[in-house]
Structures are given as C-alpha cells and as structure tokens.
Amino acid sequence: MSLPTADAPALLSVRGLEVTFGENPEPVLHSVSFDIRPGERVAIVGQSGSGKSTIIGSILRLLPGDGHITGGSILLDGEDLSRASEQRMRSIRGRRIALVPQDPASNLNPSMRVGAQIADALAASGSRSKAEIDRRVLELMTEAGIPEAERRAKQYPHEFSGGMRQRVLIAIALSREPELLIADEPTSALDVTVQRQILNHLQTLVDAHGTSLLFITHDLGVAADRTDRIIVMSEGRIVEVGTPAEILLSPQEEYTKRLVAAAPTAVAAVRVASASSAVKPGPILEVSHLVKEFKIRGQRGSILKAVDDVSFSVERGTTTAIVGESGSGKTTVARIILGLESATSGTALVDGEGITSSRGRQRRALRRRVQPVFQDPYGSLDPTYSIEKLIDEPLRIFKVGDRRSRQERVAELLDQVALPRTVAQRRPNELSGGQRQRVAIARALALHPELLICDEAVSALDVLVQEQILTLLADLQTELGLSYLFITHDLAVVRQIAHNVVVMKRGRVMEQGATNTVFESPSSDYTRELLSAIPGASLVG
C-alpha cells in the first residue's frame, strides 16, 4: 500500500476543538487538533472517558444530551462542520462521512429484515434501481463476511450472532462508499479471525477507493497493525502522536508507556497465578463426551450440534481457558456446567458430582460451588439495587447468616476485590466499568465457590482496567485456591492467565494442552490460524 504523502491536503482537519456539556464551564475536550489525509488510516487510542467518542460526536455533529462545541473548527475539505446547519449535516452523514458504531444490538431495527436495512442505506442515494440495490445488498453482505447472503438477507437481527450483526453495520456504513469512515470499536466484540477478515475488508476499501479511516479503539495491537498513525488520548487531551512503531516500541509519555505495558499480547511473558499450597490435587471439573443438540427452527428434522463430544478437565487451583470463534460452542459448554442448559448426552462433574444429572437440593448445593462472572456487569447487575444488596443477594437466597453477618461478609468481599467499603450504598450506574466488574466478582465469591466460570469477563474493559482485573483474579486464585474456567475469544489474554487451554471450533475440541505448548507448538491448523490473527504480534514479538 502507498501511504498518503505528508504534504497532501487534509481531508479532515480538526483544530483547537473544545466541547462542554451543560452549564459546566470545564471542557471535556481540551484544544484537540489533528489531520486525516485522503487514504490515511488514523487510530485514536485511550481509556473510557478519554474523549474518543466525544470527538466522533463532534465530527458528525451528534453530541449526546446538552453537549456542544465551544471552540475550534472541524474542516471537511475546507468546510467547517462545526458551523454547518443540520440540513447540511444530513447530506454529509452516510454519503461523505460514515460511522460503524460499536453496539450492533442498539443500531439495527429489530423488526426489519437485515437485507432491507442495507437496502434502505443504498436507496438513500436515489440513483439505483431496485434490481441494482438487491444485487448490491448481497455483494455488501458477502464482502463483509456474511455467508449465504441471499438466505440471511431475509432474516432479522436477533437471528444473527453479535459478530454477524457487526458485519451488517459495516455493510451499511460502506454501502455509499464514503470518503471518511469512522469506525468506533468496530471489532472489539469479534473473534480474532473474524476481526482480521473485517479489518482486511476495511483495508481493501481504503486501498481501492482512497477512503480515509478514523479508527477508535482501546486495542493497541489493532491500532498498530491497521493504521498509519496513532493518537493517544487521556482525559480529553492528546497525549502523544506517532507511527505504530514509535508508539509501541519507544513511547515518550508516561501514560503511553502504561498503556503499552498493560496491553496483552500473544508473545507476552506468561504470568499465571500459583495456587495455594493448601489446595488438594485432582480435578475440580471433569467434562466427558459432552453433547448438546438444538432443533433448528423452520427446518423440520434439522439438528445443530452446538457441542459435539467435548471432553476436558480443570485441575484445582488452576485456570483453564476455552477459546474459539462465535458459534464454537464455548458458551454453551459454560451454560451446561452452570446448570443453565441441559446436556443431550455426556457428563459434567464438579468434584465427582454430576451437574447434568443433579436435581433439587443437590443442584442447589452444586450451584453454590460453581459461580459465574459475566461479560457485561451492567447488564447482569440490577440497576435498582445498592452494591451491598447485589453482593449479599446470593447469601439471602441461600439463607446464609443473619443481616449483621451478611453485612460483615459484604465488607470482607469488598476488601478482597479492592473496592472501598463506602461503595456499598452506591448503585451500579455510579461506578466505572472496572468497578462494576469487581462487584460482579465479589458477588460470585459470596458463597465461597470453588470454581468460577468467567464468560468474556474482561473483553469489554480498557487495557489498563483489564490488567487490573486479571491481576485481581490471579491474586484471588493464589489466596483462596480458586479454580477458573475462562471463556474468551482473546488469545492474548489466555497467554497471560491460563495454565491450560482448550481450542474449540463448531462444537468440537480442535486441540488442548498446557498453554505454553499450545502457543509455541500448536498441532492444529485452526490453532495456528487463530494465533496468526492476533493483532500487534509483529511489532512486539
């Protein structure tokens, strides 16, 4: 690819941008300035609250609530968007500047077929016949990596996985061939191989059409692999700007150094916890020949084997990770172990007792020993409850102790997850994402479980917060002798925390073994493909 020349006129030029919300005179963006040239790929990297999304809202003139631009300019080919009318902005959004948003669930119409939603975006240009639109819909879906496009165009968003819904959003954004594509964490929820396909497609678009790309991400590896320049932000200010090699290999600012140090990579030194010496040897979990079949709605007699003859074990005091793409069956395995799904055949034993065959009192007892930590703490924590009520809810359900002893247990748990006891009377929306995940971990620990099932427990967190949560989990494992089954699509995280790894694809185990062995000498082509797709390894390896 030929990089844009340094003296090429900027397509987008942001100068001295300041944004405030409400009557608060303190800006949330402080004199932000940068350029994007035609065909250039620029990443903005930073934690939540750094101002990345506010920049997007400013460029598109879609700032939430009472946010408004109080200083600076945003020039698109010389036209100042900060002063453009709403009517003018409507002609620019989608046609000249398009957005791939982060959350497909809230950006697709649940009552409208997917193909029709892409067709709507195409029809907005007003220059195509229905036959041309129908043909282009299928082309866009195929380019975005959606198989069986003709059949799937007739389906609704809820019939797509999260990754597939994200591909639909990308197809919509690319439908009108914009000059500038703003991608807001477009692949953060996707598996590495799917991520690579999507990013390859975006790169092809840039090369073929000279489209500029503004990539918003917290993943330094993705930014390094896929962009020409990285802008590092913190607290509404630009901290550092440089090429990927400059930022990753020789960062100048302290904040950038912390970001680089916290970013997990496939080649990072393994930092798994050592279990307490008091932990007795042997497996806490044994899964043998597990099978789960689902009937496919609308296809008489058709069966989907979501889990197909899966066997593995988790030793006490260790971490086993299950990795795989969307649809690999890893979450279904976790749901069976948690007793949330029944198995078609096979067994899952916790300390020799059958989860799949247990009923009534025995199942309740097993559930005390196995607890989940989910991906989205905001979605899994009742927003009307105080933190104290959320953490002591399992104790109340299982009738453990009196009110005073439960309060003492909540205080002890807050100490264990490094939260101040003062948060007990606050509510989830008053906490950061990392703090909410600590509350979810405290809640999971309330009943003294032996095994935690962590389902994408850190995938929604920024790298600095992610590192803190992974360190906390490792410390708790050492202190309490906990065992973890870690469900994830992030192999770089697996390298950091897991003693053993199980690689799944389409319901089957492709490979399993010690993490070091699987990463350094993979025996499966699929594992090698997953490892080669991890972003950033070429620069930090």
Name the predicted role of every residue range.
Residues Q155-F160, M164, R427-L431, Q435:
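Conserved ABC ATPase signature
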Residues E177, H448:
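Conserved catalytic motifs of ABC-family nucleotide-binding domains
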Residues H68-D80, G346-G354, L366:
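Conserved ABC transporter NBD signature motif
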Residues L60, P64, L338:
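Helix-to-loop junction immediately C-terminal to a conserved catalytic motif
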Residues V241-G242, S250, Q512-G513, S521:
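ABC ATPase "signature
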Residues D80, E132-R151, S405-T422, L531-S532:
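Conserved ABC ATPase "signature" region
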Residues V168, A173-L174, L445:
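ABC ATPase C-loop
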